[in-house]
């Protein structure tokens, strides 16, 4: 499917060059990772693992611990 809205996908490094800051890793919890924008000081949350993969991973880990 063609991108009809003409969005450009940029990496964090490219975005840092455009806005004058960079994203610094803060922490990860579950399928989410938090970054801090060094220019604005705002904390940004990105989902870095899809929900289904994370859920199945948690279930598999629990089953593995239960039956070991």
Curated annotation (Swiss-Prot):
Gene Ontology CC annotations of this record: extracellular region
Alphabetical keyword list: Antibiotic, Antimicrobial, Bacteriocin, Plasmid, Secreted
Propeptide: 1-21
Classification via InterPro entries: Bacteriocin_IId (IPR007464), Bacteriocin_signal_seq (IPR010133)
Cell compartments where the protein resides: Secreted
Keyword ATP-binding among UniProt keywords: no
Protein name, entry field: Bacteriocin lactococcin-B
């Amino acid at each position: 499917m063609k991108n009809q809205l003409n969005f450009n996908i940029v990496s964090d490094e490219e975005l840092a060059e455009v806005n004058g800051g960079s994203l610094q890793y803060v922490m990860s919890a579950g399928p989410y990772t938090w970054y801090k924008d060094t220019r604005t000081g705002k904390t940004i949350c990105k989902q870095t693992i899809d929900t289904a993969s994370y859920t199945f991973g948690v279930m598999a880990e629990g089953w593995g611990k239960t039956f070991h």
